[in-house]
Amino acid sequence: MKSTALFRLTFVYHPKNQNEAAEYESALARAFSTVTRAPFVSNLDVPLDVWDRVEFKSITDKSAWDILEGNDAIIRNTLYVVLLTEQLVNDPLMSQVLDSIAARVHAARKVGGHDLLAYSLSTIAIRKAPPVFSNRQVKNAASLGEDRIIAHKLGLIALHRTRLILGAEKEPETLKLFISHAKHDGIFFAQALENCIRDIPELEAWYDAKDIGNGEEWLAAIQEAAGACVFVALRTNAYEFRTICLDEFMVAFSNGMPMVVVDALMQSVSGPSAVPFAAVPNIRIEDGNTYRVLTAALREHIRLLLMRNVAGERSDATTPSQVWLRLPSPAAAKLAIAFRQASPSALWLVPKAQTRPEEFSALRDWLATSNPPIELDYLESAR
């Protein structure tokens, strides 16, 4: 039986605006798509892919909305992306759809789970729409120097809003990125990525090694930011020969921080490496499109948040759980225990595909001796 969706993106536009909506619809579908995998023929358990439980729906008429609304009660998390046009607000039936969206977003102010991203192609349309649409417009769109926002930028903002719906920290709302690079040959790409971040409304934060102290303070900062930040490693030819870069990578890796590796090597094929680059998502951008790096970073953070939602379904509500993207090292586990609050998590969950059985068993036995004891389990099998 198919599992209930953890999240749904609903794109609403008027059918007369299909030509204008096509590029935005395509960009949103790509941003939230599930990666097609080859048939799984192993005798082992099928790896958990939380993106399988993300839905994308387009609504262009009232009847389709009524069908969706009738089945939507069990979808806890929904982002409505609405292309506001005069045709949409002047259509009596589609106006009812806008009123329904406004009511859902208003009701979600206290409990969360639903939000709205409005992009208006007309000042008249935004004035005629329910007031909540004005408050949920794309921020600072005018600062882009364009009459219309580029489609892939809308996709990035939608991914960011999804983070907030799924439980990312709302203060501050901006995405935090830690950019790890070797200044010898990575500084220019890092600066290009920074400019790309500044070009996207709501994605303004920038983390670099210079912003964090060294030693224990740096380790503490990584630990505290592990669940609310994305680590981007710019893998250039000099990266593996810089001790500080390797230290940054391994600390972030062992502490379960969402990570993306940007393959910026001069050669397209590289030899074996002692650094576990292949254990995290890799992206190569030979055409220089830095927006794909942001897409990968946002999706990796959303993957962690979706896994937390899965954990909430599968674990006892009275037992707080902590999700790790990868099995933490003993040193990282000790640090995590040191940072626990007065009501510590009693259950740690990790995807089975990211563990070796002997390492999992060793860490589970060690955690059982901690004070208070912590239980370690696979995310797929936790009940």
Q: Where do the PLM segments sit?
A:
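Short secondary-structure boundary motifs at beta->alpha junctions and helix caps
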Residues: 134-149, 278-292
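Leloir-type glycosyltransferase catalytic cores
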Residues: 283-307
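Conserved N-terminal substructure of TIR/SEFIR domains
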Residues: 1-84, 94-104, 109-112, 122, ...
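Short glycine-/small-residue-rich Rossmann-like dinucleotide-binding loops
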Residues: 85-86, 236-237
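Nucleotide-sugar-dependent
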Residues: 238-243
